[in-house]
Amino acid sequence: MARGNTILCLRDQETGAETYECMIFALRKFTGGMGDEDEQQPEDNKVWTDYFLKPLDSTAKVICTRKANGEAAHLAIRFIENKFVLCVGSKNVHMLICDKSDIDKYSDGRFQVARAVAAAILNVINDLSEESVEFLCNFMHHLRLTAVFEILNPCTQHVEDLSHLERSELRFISWTSSYEDRKNNAHSYCAVNPQVGIDLAQKIGFKTVRYDIIQPTEVDERMDKIRHDYGYEGEVLYFLDSDENVIGLLKKKTAWYVVARAIREQVANALNDWNKSGSSKYDHAAREERLVKRLKAIKQWLDLSESSLSAWIEIGKGFLAYVIKLAEKSAKDNQVSVESEKCDGVSQKAFSNGDIELRNKFPQHWKTFLQQHQKSDRIMW
């Protein structure tokens, strides 16, 4: 099952006849090893090969792309009733637009991310040359492609710091297309070789993810390097056969990202608990215990050393205490803002009663905590 499946229904106004077409068909299911999923983990470090279209030993080369730490974003274009129509969105929420004024027609809350994607895509298209826009529209219409992006939004940051961005930006990842025949047979996860696809996107004028090309014999070394790297989420590896078909994908995340994200989630949950229960009923020791339990589980998945685990536990506990103190100070000072922050035209809930929107602002709070306490999250293992 592909991500973001979206079916377009066209109804003839005279005859009432309906035709259906798959408009969005993004990347299909792929996974990683233990520790590479955000929630439930695979049973072992080889489950990812179960999703391959061919045996792993059919691999002729591997393309490694940097994993952007944002939200999924999709684009499809069709020529309908003498004009190009864009289908844009994220995950399973998409909308049809022709220009910026159409975005406001999708006011329901579930379109929040889709609206941000739409605005970012139109910004990119407006910056392209007329020749590139004409090529893009005709290319995507005639080949029935989906363009897969990641949207980096400085208002909704995860673990990587995006504060340097003035507005949301897209990073092109790949071109995809729907099944090749009615029997749902598929020979490749991507419409073209990812290297060719990224190079083409760059020529059109898109910003893209970075990539490297390695040999199949270098995969284990590459995965180990990624795991030990610092400061970014990880990489996605595309396995290609001798015919340039993408026969499988693998996500591999840095240990830094896996642990930092776990701390973010544990501390955010503790903050929610503090806000709901109040300082008198909030059990800090219990929250510390949950944090430690989670980090010990990650140690097993990633095979971290005892010394690195101890270092992460110390930092995690310190950050938990730091955030709760911020919440207590905010509540004590009664810092309630009546103004809502705005980013890319989307209103964001302002700070009030200790709610510091930790999940969306984690990188800044994390960085401030480390600086104030003279700590480093560059932990060797």
Task: Name each model feature, range by range.
Residues M1-W381:
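Core nucleotide-handling region used for phosphoryl-transfer chemistry
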